[in-house]
Amino acid sequence: MCSDKNITATALVRPSWLRVKAPFSDEYQSTNELIKSLKLNTVCKEAACPNIGECWSKKHATVMILGSICTRACAFCNVSTGKPEQVDEYEPYRLSEAVMKLGLKHVVITSVDRDDISDGGASHFAKCITYIRERSPSTSIEVLTPDFLRKHDAWKIVAKARPDVYNHNIETVPSLYLKVRPGARYYNSLNLLHQVKIFDSSIFTKSGIMVGLGETKHEVLQVMDDLRAAEVDFLTIGQYLRPSARHIDVDRYVAPDEFDYYARVAKSKGFLMVSASPLTRSSYHAGEHFEKLKQMRLQNII
């Protein structure tokens, strides 16, 4: 059983398990300088990720393409909302340059929502994948895409470029969508993930949710069932952390042993991989997890 030692957020003090070291290493600085010199955005900075110090010190970064202005206004997200800039046609080349210079074995590419573009930015994702494949053929590629709501088959443009991992986050339970993710539709996100798997079963599919927003345990388990019905391979579960006072409140800080409980249940439901901890984020340890995913698939085949 999981503990009842969950901490209500009204205390406004983060528990010890959510405290991380400030980023000061030389490796962090060199990663930061390279990303700035190539004029790339990262979700690490834009979304105020708590793991930025650890990841950048290991030369891991999640690049955010298609600008830094989002057309949505999700209640949990730190990315700016407004009218986006024009698509930078040279960005795929600069991204491939960064991958090559950092010597990345695994790269994660995400983006803001671009409801203003006819395909939601899907063709730009595909160009980024193509450029990286040409210049760094041994690098595995993971995409974390928007939901491409009302962009018919836009996901297929990305899938045809054959990323190794296709990630799209479900983010929260259905009952909280209007409050947390009002511009999205739960079943649209589920369908996207399922369609990718139907299109090419060799592409690993991945999704994640945040907890601590007011969901119940039963609702979290139901999301697991829905994702397994969509044949999702990899589930991530992490604590929601409020980026600023203008964002939705944290309902509670979920104790580490409750995350352990979720991980055990998710594994029993058939996910190939599960990462569940207070500081888990979609791209956290993504390269290591990809290698484990490949091993797990081989074991299942054998």
Curated annotation (Swiss-Prot):
Q: Per its UniProt entry, which superkingdom is the organism in?
A: Bacteria
Give the similarity note: Belongs to the radical SAM superfamily. Lipoyl synthase family.
Chain segments annotated as coiled-coil in the UniProt record: none
List of residues binding [4Fe-4S] cluster 2: C70, C74, C77
Listed binding positions for [4Fe-4S] cluster 1 are C44, C49, C55, S283
Q: What Gene3D superfamilies does the record tag this protein with? A: Aldolase class I
The catalytic activity of this protein is classed by the Enzyme Commission as 2.8.1.8
Top enzyme class, one word, equals transferase
Q: What is this protein called?
A: Lipoyl synthase
Q: Which cofactor does it need?
A: [4Fe-4S] cluster
Reactions the enzyme catalyzes: [[Fe-S] cluster scaffold protein carrying a second [4Fe-4S](2+) cluster] + N(6)-octanoyl-L-lysyl-[protein] + 2 oxidized [2Fe-2S]-[ferredoxin] + 2 S-adenosyl-L-methionine + 4 H(+) = [[Fe-S] cluster scaffold protein] + N(6)-[(R)-dihydrolipoyl]-L-lysyl-[protein] + 4 Fe(3+) + 2 hydrogen sulfide + 2 5'-deoxyadenosine + 2 L-methionine + 2 reduced [2Fe-2S]-[ferredoxin]
> Bound how, and how many: what does the cofactor note say?
Binds 2 [4Fe-4S] clusters per subunit. One cluster is coordinated with 3 cysteines and an exchangeable S-adenosyl-L-methionine.
GO MF entries: 4 iron, 4 sulfur cluster binding; lipoate synthase activity; metal ion binding
GO cellular component terms given for this protein: cytoplasm
Where does the Radical SAM core domain start and stop, copy by copy? 56-272
Chief localization class? cytoplasm
Biochemical pathway: Protein modification; protein lipoylation via endogenous pathway; protein N(6)-(lipoyl)lysine from octanoyl-[acyl-carrier-protein]: step 2/2
- Give UniProt keywords alphabetically: 4Fe-4S, Cytoplasm, Iron, Iron-sulfur, Metal-binding, S-adenosyl-L-methionine, Transferase
**InterPro entries the record matches:** Aldolase_TIM, Elp3/MiaA/NifB-like_rSAM, Lipoyl_synth, rSAM
Please report a single Pfam family linked to this protein: Radical_SAM
Indicate where this protein resides in the cell: Cytoplasm
